[in-house]
Amino acid sequence: MRVHVVSDVHGNSRDLAAAGTGADALVCLGDLVLFLDYADHSRGIFPDLFGAANAGALVELRTARRFEEARELGRRLWGELDGTGVSRESVIEGAVRRQYAELFAAFPTPTYATYGNVDIPRLWPEYAEPGTTVLDGQRVEIGGRVFGFVGGGLATPMLPQALNSVRAGETPIPYVISDDEYAAKIEAVGEVDVLCTHIPPDVPELCYDTVARRFERGSAALLHAIRTTRPRYSLFGHVHQPLARRVRIGGTECVNVGHFNATGTPYVLEW
């Protein structure tokens, strides 16, 4: 049995269309939407709305850790859009829908997918075709092994939770939930052979992004589940340039499957 696993697709529909080649199934761990490509400032929703020059300026400010200036730039640009009478929510949703139409059409059959923190779960049923199974806090058998899926990201002190979306520097983050909600989904999955999540367990070397130079949120509940239920694999993404791509915890191989938008190459799981 051969399963290909991708995460952090961020608009890379071209490589996604070939990601299932030679595999019996594809697993996607979310973050389909591309809001802003740090490597190519012309790609994504932000440059489509505000131009590549403004996108480049925003990336430069964030990379230099001048976050307040980055937020001010975002507020100014969004404020100008608001001044035209156009709803920013409708503009963003329209752009996300266009990306989803292209990305979901690229999924092979069968595909098993869960949400990332930049995805909009309520839209997925409109685009998921019969060969795509969406799971969140649920489990499924693939080739005789049980896979559990938990989607979404966690709120942080600087990224407060909201009912519909939250904004950090005026960037929409639609699927961020509380620690308690996340832990409940982990518990609902129970004992599995392969535990598939968007975010990593709360292990420093798995959570630290060496390019962004910051720790992303990992899940303590996920780490506890790995230690107590001992799945064969814990597969995740979210951190694009982690300090460590894999760590062994007891008998569990914990693997960041890679930043698919940049690599175009799936992680391969065989048994």
Annotated model-derived regions:
Residues 36-43, 47-86, 145-212:
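Active-site-proximal loop/helix segment associated with metal-binding centers of metalloenzymes
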Residues 6, 11-142, 257:
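Core catalytic region of metal-dependent phosphoesterases/phosphodiesterases
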Residues 139-144, 160, 223-228, 241-271:
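Binuclear metal-dependent phosphoesterase catalytic core
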Residues 25, 192, 219-236:
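Proline-aspartate-enriched helix->loop->beta-strand connector
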